[in-house]
Amino acid sequence: MSRFARLLLIVALFFTNAWAKTVKETLRITWKEGAPNGQARELIYTNGQFPSPTLVWDEDDDIEGQRPIQPGNKFVYRFKASPPGNHWYHSHEKMSLVDGLYGAIHIRLTGTPRRFHMNDAKSQARRPKGDRTGLWSQISQDKDDIKAMENAAYDPEYLVVSDWSQYTSEEYWKISTDSGLLVLYAYVAPSILVNGKGEVYCPGQKFLQAELAPGLVEDAFPPGTEVSDKGCFPADLDQVQGGPWNITKRPDLIPPRVREGCVASRHENATIVVDPSKNNGWVSMHFVAAATTAQITFSVDSHEFWLYEIDGNYVNPRKFASAVMSAGETFSVMIKLDQEPGKYTMRIPNSGASQVLGGFAEMVYKGCEREEKAGKAYLSYGGNPTSPDVEKNSFFPWQLDTDHMSPWPPNKPRPGNADEEHLLVLGRVGAPYNYTMNTKYLYPVDFQNDDPLLFYPSATRDTENDGLVLRTKNGSWVDLILQVSTLPGDTASSEHFMHKHGSKTWRIGFGTGVWNYTSVEEAIQERPQDFNLETPGLRDTWITAFSIGGEAYWSVFRYFVDNPGPWLFHCHIELHLMGGMGIAILDGVDAWPEHIPEEYQLR
C-alpha cells in the first residue's frame, strides 16, 4: 500500500487582510483513484480536487499554517504573503509532483509606491510596490489600456501545466532502480495536462518521427535513431544512460508499455473562457510549469502575447508568438483579445528535447463556446515553429544571447567580484539515476530530518554530509558557479532546471569549457563576451546547457544575502532531485537567532 493511502494531512492557512479579517483555508490531502487523462491511476487530491486549489492572497497578508506533520500532530507557522506575483506551491517529499501535489498561488499587488534605491544592496534584490504604469506603458501608451491591464493582472486566468504518467512516483522510481537504467519520465508520461485535464494521443510513429526538432537526432544521437510510437527515444542510448557504471542492468524488468505501446484515450482538455468586453479586451494569464521533467512550449493560435513576469518577478515586456518554459518556472503574459470572436487552440507541447508530445487547451471568447475552432497555428504537434517568422518571434531561454528578459524596473547586481564564490560540479555518480550537485555527494530525500539544519546549523560540520551544505554570511554578495559535463560517465549531460529557494539570482555568466579561473572577476576579464552584469535576468529557476556533443559548460549566478535561513538549491526535474541533485544553502547563518522561540522548539 502506498504511503499516501494511510495519510490524511490537514493544512490550515489563515491570513489577515487590511481590514483585520481573518480567513481560514484548510487543505486536506488525500490519495485516491482518478483519471485526469482518461486513464485511471491513484493520485493526490487536495480538498477533493486535482490539481490543488489556487490560493489568492494580497501582498503583506499575514499567513498562518502548518509545516509537514505526522498523523495526529500539528504545528503552526507564520509568514507574510510576499512578494506579489505568480507563484506556486508543491511538495519536496520524494517525487510527489508525479502524484499531483501542486497548485498555483497569486499574491496580488497592494500598497503605495515606494522609492527604489538602485544603489542600495537590499533594494537591488527586492521589487517595488504600487505603481506599475511604467510596466504597462511598454505595451501600450493608451491610458485606458494601462488601466485595463492593471485590472487584468489583478484577476488573471490560471493555467497549471504538468506532464502525466500512468505510474505513481513509487512505481516510476522502482522501474529505474530495479532495471539499473535511467528511465526518463518522458518514457512514462503520455500526456500534457492543463489544470488537471488532458488526453492521450497516438498519432503514429512515422508522424512523431517527422515532428522531431530539426537537427536533434543528427546532433545528439547515432544515425538511424528513431522515436517510439509514444514519441520516446531509445532507453539504451549512451547519451541517455551515460557511464559505464558498475551496476547490473536488467532491461527485462522495465514494463512493456513504458517506452512504446501507445494507448489512446479521449477525455477533455481545459477550456479558458475570456471576455473581450472586459478590461478593454486585455486578459492576463498565469502559467505554472508544474511538470516533473518536461520543458514545455506554449502558444495561442492567432494571438501573440506580451511576457511581463517570470518567476514572480516583473520583466521588461516583450511580444512573442510562443515561449519555452522549464519545469518549476512561472510565466505571466498579457493577451489582447482583438481577433474574430471564436474558439482558439492553445498549444502546449513538450519542447522536444526529451519526447515528442503534444498538449492542448482552448481559449474561447465568451459566447462562442459552440463554434468551430479558428485561427492560425504557431506551433506544430511536437513544438516546432510553423514558420521562420514564428521562430524569430519566440522566446528561448537557452543562453545569454537568447534570453533578453531583463528585470523591470532596472535591477542589476553589484559589479566586480562577489564576497563569496562557490563552485558546484553537477552530474551523475555511480549509476545513471544518481545525480550530484557537488562532485560526488548525493542529497537524500530525508537529509537531516532528525536534526534539521534550521535548529542545528552546525550538525554536519566535520562529517561527510558537510559536502551537502553551503554557508553564507548575511549582507554578502555570493556567486554560485555551476559546471556541467565534466564528471566521468556524464560528459553528455542533460539539461538541469536549477531552482534556489529563499532568493532570486541573476545569471551573469554562461560559457563553454571547464571552469579553471581563480575568480569570476578573472573570467570576466578573459571572456567579457560570456558575461552580462548590466541587464541580466533575475529569477529563481535557471536552465543549464544540454551538452549534445559532450562539451563542458558553466554558468554563474549572483545573489545578495538578505533573507537568512536554510534554503534548498536543487534541480526541478523530479528524477534528478530524487537521485540526489540538491544542496542546502544556509544563507546569512551568522544572523540566525541564538535562541529558538518556544513555539518553534522541536518536541
Swiss-Prot record:
Binds 4 Cu cations per monomer. Induction: Expressed during isotropic growth (swelling) but not during polarized growth (germ tubes and hyphae). Expressed exclusively in the later stages of conidiation and in blastospores when M.anisopliae is living as a saprophyte. During infection processes, is also expressed by appressoria on the cuticle surface and hyphal bodies inside the insect haemocoel. Keywords: Copper, Glycoprotein, Metal-binding, Oxidoreductase, Repeat, Signal. Its cofactor is Cu cation. The keyword Phosphoprotein does not apply. Residues 66-108, 159-349, 460-588 form the Plastocyanin-like domain. The keyword Membrane does not apply. Pathway: Pigment biosynthesis. One of its GO terms (cellular component) is cell surface. Cu cation 3 binds at H92, H501, H570. Cu cation 4 binds at H496, H499, C571, H576. InterPro entries: Cu-oxidase-like_N, Cu-oxidase_2nd, Cu-oxidase_C, Cu-oxidase_fam, Cu_oxidase_CS, Cu_oxidase_Cu_BS, Cupredoxin. Cu cation 2 binds at H90, H572. It comes from the Eukaryota. Disruption phenotype: Reduces virulence to caterpillars because of impaired appressoria and delayed post-infection events. Produces a yellow-conidia phenotype with increased conidial susceptibility to heat shock and UV-B stress. GO terms for molecular function: copper ion binding; oxidoreductase activity. Its EC number is 1.10.3.-. Cu cation 1 binds at H499. It is found in: Cell surface. Glycans are attached at N246, N269, N434, N474, N516. Residues 1-20 form the signal peptide. It is an enzyme of class 1 (oxidoreductase). Laccase; part of the Pks1 gene cluster that mediates the biosynthesis of an anthraquinone derivative pigment that contributes to conidial pigmentation that provides protection from UV radiation, heat and cold stress. The polyketide synthase Pks1 produces 1-acetyl-2,4,6,8-tetrahydroxy-9,10-anthraquinone though condensation of acetyl-CoA with malonyl-CoA. The dehydratase EthD and the laccase Mlac1 further convert the anthraquinone derivative into the final conidial pigment. Belongs to the multicopper oxidase family. This is Laccase 1. It comes from Metarhizium anisopliae. The gene is Mlac1.
